[in-house]
Amino acid sequence: MVMTLLGPILPLLTIRWGLTDMQAGYLFFAQFASSCIGMLASGMLVHRYGYRLTLMFGLIVSAVGVALLARADWGFGLTAVCIFGVAFGTNTPATNLFVANTYAPKSASALSLLNSSWGIGAMACPLLIALAERQHRVPLFLYALSASLVVLAISMSAVSFRVDAEKPPALQTSGSTVNPWKHQLLLLVAVLFFVYVGSENSVGGWVASYARRISTDSSTFWTITPSFFWGALLLGRALAPFALRKTHETKLAGAGVTLAALGVSVLLTAKTMTPVVIGASLAGLGFSSVYPINVSLLSHWFGEATTRVSGAIFAVGNLGGAVLPWVVGALSTKLGSLRAGLSVPLCGALGMLIFYLVHKTKSS
């Protein structure tokens, strides 16, 4: 929920702080650029303190950032966003790699289910913000969210992580064990993560602002449009394990980014709220299986060296989450059209489709 908070709350912050789209884009940049720091530190923290303490640390830091955002001005707000960005960066690779190692034979399915639980929070966040906005209680909502994170962190102190008492097992794969930094796929995979995270967050982060400008009435329906994106993404990740029983990972990912490109295209042609909802839903469904599949394929691409390169790859991915949403805002400000800015995730989806088509051909 925390990492999708900016999307639905961004129009409110834009009004409160008097921001242009380019300035609003700096919030996304701050969030994901700071998360790179957490991602680079995540492996060291897990190695030294274990998964449980690392996750507790991330939750507490995230709670601090959310609480500070409740009453912050523009400058202090950037700081608050950076704080929970670091927390997200710490917990994301730790959680994903823990699941990938534990369920190595079926890691793509397990990661899809894991990310489905994340999607529940992402879908609920816009609905809760819309409710809080109608009651003029958005700061109270942020304080409540912060308190919930603290409670969750405290509750984890009673949970025993078996793997923390063991040496983390190497992924059982048939991948290559050569120096991963010289692997011919390393740069391409890093770019793939960069483009995916950036494209997903560009749509999820800007769709509420886009819907608000299209809306012709005084209702706050636009605030819940991200829920259609994240809800479809949640549904897709819940269904992905079933699809993966009959479909190869790269084939499913290729179909996904094709559907995402179609969804963004519908958004770009929207003049009323109905196509916005349809486009956001198609884009979310299309993007849903791509990230879990990419994570699961790391072990096939890099073998036992996956843990050595994963931190850098995750960090590059989050850099995409920082850069591409900012580019959307910058293009919108320069060209005077958020519609033009949203061409960025469309190009990203088409670029990923090319990668999967080429990789599938080489694999064959």
Language-model features: where?
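Residue-level signature of mid-helix packing/kink "hotspots" within the transmembrane helices
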Residues: 4, 31-40, 123, 230-238, ...
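Extracytoplasmic gate region of multi-pass secondary transporters
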Residues: 6-7, 184-227, 231-235
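Interfacial helix-cap and linker-helix signal at transmembrane-aqueous boundaries
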Residues: 13-14, 45-46, 128-136, 211-212, ...
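Conserved MFS/SLC helix-loop-helix module at the cytosolic interface between two early adjacent transmembrane helices
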Residues: 36-75
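Helix-loop junctions at membrane interfaces in 12-TM secondary transporters
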Residues: 70-80, 269-278
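Cytoplasmic helix-loop-helix junction between adjacent transmembrane helices
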Residues: 81-116
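Helix-loop-helix hairpin linking two adjacent transmembrane segments in secondary transporters
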Residues: 105, 113-164
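C-terminal transmembrane helical hairpin of 12-TM major facilitator-type secondary transporters
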Residues: 250-294
